[in-house]
Swiss-Prot record:
Its EC number is 2.8.2.11. One of its GO terms (biological process) is protein N-linked glycosylation. One of its GO terms (cellular component) is plasma membrane. Pathway: Lipid metabolism; sphingolipid metabolism. Keywords: Glycoprotein, Golgi apparatus, Lipid metabolism, Membrane, Signal-anchor, Sphingolipid metabolism, Transferase, Transmembrane, Transmembrane helix. The gene is GAL3ST1. It catalyses: a beta-D-galactosyl-(1<->1')-N-acylsphing-4-enine + 3'-phosphoadenylyl sulfate = an N-acyl-1-beta-D-(3-O-sulfo)-galactosyl-sphing-4-enine + adenosine 3',5'-bisphosphate + H(+); a 1-O-alkyl-2-acyl-3-O-(beta-D-galactosyl)-sn-glycerol + 3'-phosphoadenylyl sulfate = a 1-O-alkyl-2-acyl-3-(beta-D-3-sulfogalactosyl)-sn-glycerol + adenosine 3',5'-bisphosphate + H(+); a beta-D-Gal-(1<->1')-ceramide + 3'-phosphoadenylyl sulfate = 1-(3-O-sulfo-beta-D-galactosyl)-ceramide + adenosine 3',5'-bisphosphate + H(+); a 1,2-diacyl-3-O-(beta-D-galactosyl)-sn-glycerol + 3'-phosphoadenylyl sulfate = 1,2-diacyl-3-(3-O-sulfo-beta-D-galactosyl)-sn-glycerol + adenosine 3',5'-bisphosphate + H(+). It holds the Pfam family Gal-3-0_sulfotr. This is Galactosylceramide sulfotransferase. The keyword Transmembrane applies. It comes from Homo sapiens (Human). The keyword Transferase applies.
């Protein structure tokens, strides 16, 4: 006698239950990987009074803003506010290499590659944090909270960040983060960015999940309200506060000039600021913003536009103080050294698609649902003199964090799930 066959609805019900349980599990994991946005400031760490107290501060460097010669000591205490889509991953690699070379102490996130972004930074988010702990370098993604950061580094720490033309940043952020911003899902056109910019108020909800990625992202990363009225006096007050807190604001569009100013500020060597462009996106089949759409994107991100204009002007004042001719010489030297390292280190001499990367250790983190981020293949025969530097210059952020001892269990779990589901 044949065993009784299961009814179709029973199999369907079991499938639905299993699917619901699995989906719930994924949502739980994702809630750890991407925490909900809180409108208010994170509560200040109770041990705020127990600020960083190093046994002895490093000698103060001579800040040579006027380009004059003078002895200085390399600066080793640095806070880098890593903003989104601004070539900040390339800067991160520079800081990782310097810190590793000099055995400096990093303040790493606990379990992830960011400090629970987009919530505000708090000292309790630092891996192995103890009251009074002191660090040399803080450089992972965070939503900036000055008082919390200030208490983790010596008083002579240098604060830096990097900005980008707000329209271009918005374009990059829209394409990169769009799949995890639900408000973009209702856009039907093949060119969703153009459709959005035709009437952004129709689609945008400031309280929507991950909505901060689509408006005034620089202002948001700096810890300010990205929905302020652009005519509010608070906007200029915040911009001036950034100017007081940060010793140098770099510009992505003038990256080499920015690195020359950074090298001078920190009293570093040329080798310390060599770089390869990391986390670069493959060219999109969608055309770049036209003149009209560029204007719309600029207007939509007006807070960031005010911020960028202010620091674009101050940047060129710093260049003038440094000396135009001197800047041209040092930029040329940096580019020559970068080109030399490219021929020594990179197989084929250029970045490649993810599918063409041969070493898993060189695979960059990819946005959800696509493999649009380029990476590199390391040459197989590199002389002993350059082998270590080449590998460090080409190592992606996640792998470098693990090499430096960061505990990335949440990030690794999320990667496992994504690989399993082929997201």
């Amino acid at each position: 006698m044949l065993p009784p066959q299961k009814k179709p609805w029973e199999s369907m019900a079991k499938g639905l239950v299993l699917g619901a349980l699995f989906t719930s599990f994924l949502l739980l994991v994702y809630s750890y990987a991407v925490p909900p946005l809180h409108a208010g400031l994170a509560s200040t760490t109770p041990e705020a009074a127990a600020s960083c107290s190093p046994p002895a501060l490093e000698p103060e460097a001579v800040i040579r803003a006027n380009g004059s010669a003078g002895e200085c000591q390399p600066r080793r205490n640095i806070v880098f506010l890593k903003t989104h889509k601004t070539a900040s991953s390339t800067l991160l690699n520079i800081l990782f290499r310097f810190g590793q070379k000099h055995r400096l102490k990093f303040a790493f996130p606990n379990g992830r590659n960011d400090f629970d972004y987009p919530t505000f930074f708090a000292r309790s988010l630092v891996q192995d944090y103890r009251p009074g702990a002191c660090f040399n370098i803080i450089c992972n993604h965070m939503r900036f909270h000055y008082d919390e950061v200030r208490g983790l580094v010596p008083t002579n720490a240098i604060f830096i960040t990097v900005l980008r033309d707000p329209a271009r940043l918005f374009e990059s952020s829209f394409h990169y983060f769009g799949p995890v911003v639900p408000l973009t899902w209702k856009l039907s056109a093949g060119d969703k960015l153009t459709e959005f910019l035709q009437d952004p108020d129709r689609y945008y909800d400031p309280n929507g999940f991950n909505a901060h990625y689509l408006r005034n992202l620089l202002f948001f990363d700096l810890g300010y309200d990205n929905s302020l009225d652009p005519s509010s006096p608070q906007v200029q007050e915040h911009i001036l506060e950034v100017e007081r807190r940060f010793h140098l604001v770099l510009l992505q569009e003038y990256f080499d000039e920015s690195l020359v100013l950074l090298k001078d500020l920190l009293c570093w060597e040329l080798e310390d600021v060599l770089y390869f462009k990391l986390n670069a996106r493959r060219d999109s089949p969608v055309p770049r913003l036209s003149g009209e759409l560029y204007g719309r994107a600029t207007a939509w991100n007006m807070l960031d536009s005010h911020l960028y204009r202010h620091f674009n002007a101050s940047f060129w004042r710093k260049v003038e103080a440094f000396g135009r001719e001197r800047m041209a010489r040092e930029v040329a030297a940096l580019r020559h050294a970068n080109e030399r390292m490219r021929t020594i280190c990179i197989d084929g001499g250029h970045a490649v698609d993810a599918a063409a990367i041969q070493d898993e250790a060189m695979q960059p983190w990819q946005p959800l649902g696509t493999k649009s981020i380029l990476g590199y293949n390391l040459k197989k025969s590199i002389g002993q003199r350059h082998a270590q530097l080449c590998r460090r210059m080409l190592t992606p952020e996640i792998q470098y964090l693990m090499d430096l001892g960061a505990n990335l269990w949440v990030t690794k779990l999320w990667k496992f799930i994504r690989d399993f589901l082929r997201w």
